[in-house]
Amino acid sequence: MSLHSLCVPTILLISVLSICLSSGGSSDSKLHRILIKRDAKEIESRPKAYISVQQSKAKEFLSGLHRTKRNVWDRSRPDVQQWIQQFMYMGYDEARLETDLSYWMDQARSNDQGRQHHHDENAPMSQQDPRYNRHGANVNYDYY
């Protein structure tokens, strides 16, 4: 009896809320539309100098921004300079060399067996799906 007495008010509440939320025909409420109109009027009424920055100041700020060059290796060492010269002799340009080196160094870091967990990290669902929890290759037994 108590379950029935709880279900009826709950169903009535859900139906009233769904009717109230679906009325109006649009996704935005009237209050939301009024607030948007008010904000648009405030923005239009502001003077332009209040919003924008002078062009000279903007160019001065943007001219200082530049991306620093990525160096995977310490180029001050003579052996590194020799390696880079050899790679460039083989046809690599420096940007391609940096890209390839960072890729392979990241690969080496991610495939380190000491950092592997006891589940297969390459599986579609990882450890969440028990079918892909394998105890074989790529398993670090230090965790047991």
Swiss-Prot record:
Q: Which residues cross the membrane?
A: none
Q: Region annotation Disordered: residue ranges?
A: 109-144
Entry's Pfam families?
Answer: Augurin
Subcellular location(s) of the protein: Secreted; Cytoplasm; Apical cell membrane
GO cellular component terms listed in the entry, alphabetical order: apical plasma membrane; cytoplasm; extracellular space
Q: Does the keyword Repeat apply?
A: no
Q: Write out the GO biological process terms.
A: anaphase-promoting complex-dependent catabolic process; cellular senescence; central nervous system development; G1 to G0 transition; negative regulation of cell population proliferation; regulation of cell population proliferation; response to wounding
Q: Keywords for this entry?
A: Cell membrane, Cleavage on pair of basic residues, Cytoplasm, Membrane, Secreted, Signal
- InterPro entries according to UniProt: Augurin
Q: Where is the signal peptide?
A: 1-18
Which parts of this protein are propeptide?
A: 19-68
Skewed-composition ranges (Basic and acidic residues) = 112-122
Sequence similarity: Belongs to the augurin family.
What does it do?
A: Probable hormone. Required for the proper formation of the central nervous system by attenuating cell proliferation during development.
Q: What is this protein called?
A: Augurin-B
Task: Tell me the organism's taxonomic lineage.
Answer: Eukaryota, Metazoa, Chordata, Craniata, Vertebrata
The gene name on file is ecrg4b
